[in-house]
């Protein structure tokens, strides 16, 4: 994973914009990433970074970063802007290279993310998609806050994947956060042959209620995987907060369907290792949705991104990943 990250940075020729939530690497890996960024600047690449400014307020889902942070070294190496993580997180994990290629997904720059967690990275060679991500980055860069970013629509872009046409578009939260949740819910409702879901948690009301209805109707093949300890924490929060208690019966219907797998990850602790189920992927027939957005209510208010990809080969690859993860933790 480190080699892929460095190779992407090394491929930059004119510009590299980075939006990263969490960067906790050991000294060796951190030094190599910083060296790659220094080398990019040395060959004339304009490098910029925005990152989440860590804080002490407890956030059980997602768990807060821990251990030695690489963000300070990143900020010292390249022009950077810290985005306050209060009240909402700068939760993106993307790069835009040369205004024509996007790297995004669920993967932070941490050893745990690379070795202990299920995660997804998508690299899309598309100037049209890069334009949308650049617009989101510019909003974060200039405003220096999560609030007010992502409030625009992106037109679909077309590229080739595995010899077939692929259509992709992006949505960004918080500006389009509610639209993200409703889009995922609509795609779930429309699934006819297969529905595959990997997410740390399921707390979005529209998504959870639609999923429960699809399972009750038994009209498509469904497999769902979430993180066990994180969902238990969510259920405890719902029990304490009467305003969200209506969601518990919906989740119990999902659990009772027999289609749910819970990853028995290590409960949150201050130091490594961390091995959460961290991938964010939804496959509805030939449509795949993936990015940093984790199907949660809070995700609609964070700085997040979501790709909607229409492609049989790409959706097959995402479905295969979800099926392998589900098989690992089912039963």
Where are these regions (language model features)?
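PLD/PLD-like phosphodiesterase catalytic module centered on the HKD motif
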Residues: 1-6, 28-102, 107, 111-144, ...
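A short, aliphatic-rich alpha-helical micro-motif
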Residues: 9-10, 97, 188-189
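Acidic/histidine-rich, surface-exposed loop or edge segments in extracytoplasmic proteins
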Residues: 17-21
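Long, charged amphipathic helices and adjacent flexible linkers at domain junctions
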Residues: 150-159
């Amino acid at each position: 994973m480190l080699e892929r990250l460095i190779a992407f940075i090394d491929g930059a020729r004119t510009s590299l914009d980075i939006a990263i939530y969490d960067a906790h690497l050991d000294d060796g890996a951190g030094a190599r990433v910083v060296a790659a960024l220094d080398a990019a600047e040395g060959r004339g690449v304009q490098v910029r970074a925005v990152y989440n400014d860590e804080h002490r307020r407890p956030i059980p889902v997602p768990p807060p970063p821990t251990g030695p942070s690489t963000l300070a070294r990143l900020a010292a190496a390249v022009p950077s802007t810290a985005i306050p993580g209060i009240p909402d997180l700068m939760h993106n994990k993307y790069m835009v290279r040369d205004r024509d290629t996007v790297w995004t997904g669920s993967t932070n720059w941490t050893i745990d993310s690379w070795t202990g967690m299920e995660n997804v990275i998508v690299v899309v060679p598309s100037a049209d998609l890069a334009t949308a991500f650049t617009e989101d980055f510019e909003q974060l860069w200039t405003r220096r806050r999560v609030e007010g970013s992502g409030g625009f629509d992106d037109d679909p872009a077309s590229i080739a994947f595995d010899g077939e046409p692929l259509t992709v578009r992006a949505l960004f939260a918080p500006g389009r956060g509610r639209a993200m949740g409703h889009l995922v819910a609509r795609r779930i409702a429309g699934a006819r042959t297969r529905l595959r879901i990997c997410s740390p948690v399921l707390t979005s009301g529209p998504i959870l209620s639609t999923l429960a209805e699809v399972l009750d109707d038994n009209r498509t093949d469904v497999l769902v995987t979430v993180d066990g300890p994180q969902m238990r924490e969510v259920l405890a929060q719902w029990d304490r907060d009467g305003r969200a208690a209506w969601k518990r019966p919906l989740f119990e219907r999902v659990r009772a369907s027999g289609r749910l797998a819970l990853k028995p990850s290590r409960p949150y602790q201050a130091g490594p290792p961390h091995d959460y189920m961290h991938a964010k992927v939804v496959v509805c027939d030939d449509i795949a949705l993936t990015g940093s957005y984790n199907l949660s209510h809070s995700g609609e208010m964070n700085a997040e991104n979501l790709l909607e990809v229409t492609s049989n080969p790409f959706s097959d690859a995402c479905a295969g990943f979800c099926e392998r993860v589900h098989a690992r933790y089912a039963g």
